[in-house]
Every structure is written in C-alpha cells, then in structure tokens.
Amino acid sequence: MSLEIQDSEVDIVIAALQPNLTTFFEAWRPFFSRFHIIVVKDPDMAEELQIPTGFDLKVYTKSDMGVLGATSIDFSGHSCRYFGYLVSRKKYVISIDDNCLPAKDNGGLTVDAVAQHMSNLKTPATPFFFNTLYDPFRKGADFVRGYPFSLREGVECMLSCGLWLHNADYDPMTHVVKRNQRNTTYVDAVMTVPLGAMMPVSGINVAFNREVLGPVMFPALRLRKEGKHRWDTLEDVWNGLCAKVVCDRLRYGVKTGLPYVMRSDAEAGKALESLKEWEGVKVMDVVLPFFESLKLSSTSVTVEDCVKELTSIVKEKLGPQNAIFAKAADAMEEWTKLWKSHGAQSA
C-alpha cells in the first residue's frame, strides 16, 4: 500500500521567529534545495529577514495575512506557521522550527529529516494493533508472530511527528529545574501511535498530508500570557490532540519517532524563574481527560465533519470552564471558514 510522493507535492513551511536565517538555511541546503519553501515571518517582528539565495521560496509577511480580513485567529509567534499551511497548495507539508539544524544519527551520518518524513507518510501506519518490533514497514523490521494478517495492510499515515536532540522541549517549570539537561539519546525507531492513545505533538519537527488533514491543522488554543518560546505555548499540543482524534475516527494513522533534528541552545539559558505559575499545567489537566473520553459520531465522515463536531463539543463542554477554550472553539470555527475560502485549493 506504499505511496509515491513526488518532490513537487511537498512544501516546506518555516515559521521565521528570528531575522537572520542564514545559518539555518545553509545547514539545511542539501535537503531543502529541491523543494518549494514557504517562509512565514512572525507579524510581530520588525527586522528584515536575512535568507541566503539559491532556494525556491516565497516569504509571507503581516501584509499577506491582512488579505484574510478580520479574523479571530492570531498568527503571531509560533502560530505564524499555520498561515503557511493555509496558503500552501501542495499535498504534503513539512515544518521545522527555525532554531533547529540537521541532526546526526548514531553512526555520525547527517539525518535527512525531509526524506524520513516522506518515508513515514508514504508507508502505512498500523494503529489498530501494536507491533512490538516498531514500524513493520521499515527496512529490517516486520510484523511479529501473532499480528493478524487482516490488519497487515495498514492504513494511510496522515501525520508524522519527528523528535529532537540537544535542547529539550520542556514546560517552563521543568525548564528551570533541568536547565542544563539535554536530549542525547538517538532512538533509531518509528512507531505508529495506537488507536485511542493521545500524545503531546510538538510543532518543532512535523509533517502531514495537507490535502486530507489541512482542515484540522489550526492554531486554536492560546494561553493568556503566550510568548515566543515553545515553553510558552500549547497551540501545537492542542492541534495534535485534535488531529489525533480525527485520525482515529476516520481510521488514519499517526507516527512518531524518526526523524530527529538538533535544537539549538539559543533559548535554553533564558531567565525563567519569573514563571512561578504556568497556565498550561492546569489546562492540560482538563484537556487530556476531555480528549481521552471524546468519541466523534459515526455521522462525521470527513475531516471537515469531524472539525465541526469537535468544535461544537469544545464549545459546549470546555467553553464554560475557561475562556481560553471558548476562544479556541471560535478559532476552530474561523479556521474552517478560512480553509474553505483560502486553503482548500490544491496545486
């Protein structure tokens, strides 16, 4: 059931939160140069972007976002990458944070994160029964004894969640306590996230089938004091939970593991002691049980149907508990309209 993915079907979307992207693009040149690239500049950043030549890319700025008209969606900070998802016209999107460089595997070879994401998306996922030997479609692996033959064809993978080395992706309090701790373990594995299992998807290093999953790849949940660092945000985690619920309902797959990227230390030393209380802790204590118990109805047969139903449930069940959930539901509803008017077209 493996698919073929052409280079012309892929957009690489980069959210530019820093003005000088020279080091980033030069490091990724061997892997990015054959693809079309969308760079979305944080609308709050005044400085001009510095991008080396030799890439097939288009830069989108605050003025481009203004074309959408009045909208409740905030595309600032890390959320600016979602504008890239909206304006892309390719079937697949790969997005990597601008403070990440190519990683090296256990043999010292530089990892082609783009190629690995494409491999994850074009080979089937196996969400309905866990294969204890990781991804059975990777070279050197297979289905284990006892794995039902009726399930071995798998289903299409819609979301590929990559990982990272070096600077860890912690919540603020953990970042303070473990300021000097680094991710150093490279695990050479890919696995399908089982049906019904939830996980915190990170926007640091991710790829997805935009043609199918685009309507649910939105920036909806924003914390009251959201900043420009990953530890300030939950937009990607909320987005990932929504996407996973939709994939489970429509019998699509989600993978996690390879590829790795190398996160820089640029934000690791920031003073975080002032963050005595992070709203995200309390939010996640509400969010996770909600998504774990959520079952979309059998009448939702498309991603758009699922998003509409999910939006209604969020508004009804979570909205009265906290204003940020009500605003998230509004943003999800708004994204549906924007997708129909600006995002639904394909190349």
Swiss-Prot record:
InterPro entries (UniProt xref): RGP, RGP_fam
Modification after translation, per record: Is not reversibly glycosylated in vitro by UDP-glucose, UDP-xylose and UDP-galactose.
GO biological process, one term: UDP-L-arabinose metabolic process
UniProt signal peptide: none
Annotated site residues (Required for activity) in this chain: 145, 152
Cell wall biogenesis/degradation keyword on record: yes
Compartmental location: Golgi apparatus
Keywords: Cell wall biogenesis/degradation, Glycoprotein, Golgi apparatus
CC per GO annotation: cytosol; Golgi apparatus
Superkingdom, taxonomy of origin: Eukaryota
Glycoprotein listed as a keyword: yes
Pfam families noted in UniProt: RGP
GO molecular function: UDP-arabinopyranose mutase activity
Primary subcellular site in the record, as a coarse category: Golgi
Record note on quaternary structure: Heteromers with UAM1 and UAM3.
Name of the protein described by the UniProt record: Probable inactive UDP-arabinopyranose mutase 2
Species name: Oryza sativa subsp. japonica
